């Protein structure tokens, strides 16, 4: 049985992750953290009834992780929180699933160093949906044959998402850029200027959109659109739980969803 701890357990993603953890026959929830609602049952927020696991103050992360004997910590919070909490967990010997987006290169370096020092296993991905990771594979292949086409990425999310562009859009841009030998990124368009070899990246924040991503390859007289639409956050929670089961069987190191899915 895998002992799982969840950060941000009272939030939209965290509560879905709790729900999926308790529905797994190979996992049990042993700790749940947030910045408020201390002492309340984690099952209350996941709407699954009482679980006997109270919400703990994230300030007590290291102590609770050790006392609960957590094997893996799942973190879908915010960049400023993850850069503090992930190193604490790694140095406590707890494996990590990180779905936080908006990490700067400097923050990512801090996290990577802590994982290496702690000799734990971690999956770090901007998107845990199986479909999105297949989408990544498809656009990589398409870009190899369409390097002379104009390439644009359009993403849309709900109006509460703080970071823009999305981590998924940035990962898509990196995949395409690597496939075509490098391109400059342009975020939105404004003014009058010549265009070079670039990838345009455009973000929309509106309503309750779960997550839409479109990659547009446009040539003369034709265009190809490759699209992924998320209808529910459940796909991210299910993918994170799948990754947590997988990572606990791996040697220490930093992995991606490509590794989890064998893509």
Curated annotation (Swiss-Prot):
Q: What GO molecular-function term can you cite, just one?
A: 4-hydroxy-tetrahydrodipicolinate reductase
Indicate the principal place this protein occupies in or around the cell.
cytoplasm
Q: Which residues bind (S)-2,3,4,5-tetrahydrodipicolinate?
A: 158, 167-168
Question: Pfam families, alphabetically?
Answer: DapB_C, DapB_N
User: Active site at which residues?
Assistant: 157 (proton donor/acceptor), 161 (proton donor)
Q: What does this protein do?
A: Catalyzes the conversion of 4-hydroxy-tetrahydrodipicolinate (HTPA) to tetrahydrodipicolinate.
Q: Where does this polypeptide localize?
A: Cytoplasm
Which residues are NAD(+)-binding?
Answer: 8-13, 34, 99-101, 125-128
PROSITE patterns for this protein: DAPB
Protein name per UniProt? 4-hydroxy-tetrahydrodipicolinate reductase
Question: Which family is annotated?
Answer: Belongs to the DapB family.
UniProt organism field: Methanosarcina barkeri (strain Fusaro / DSM 804)
**PANTHER family hit by this protein:** 4-HYDROXY-TETRAHYDRODIPICOLINATE REDUCTASE 1, CHLOROPLASTIC-RELATED, DIHYDRODIPICOLINATE REDUCTASE
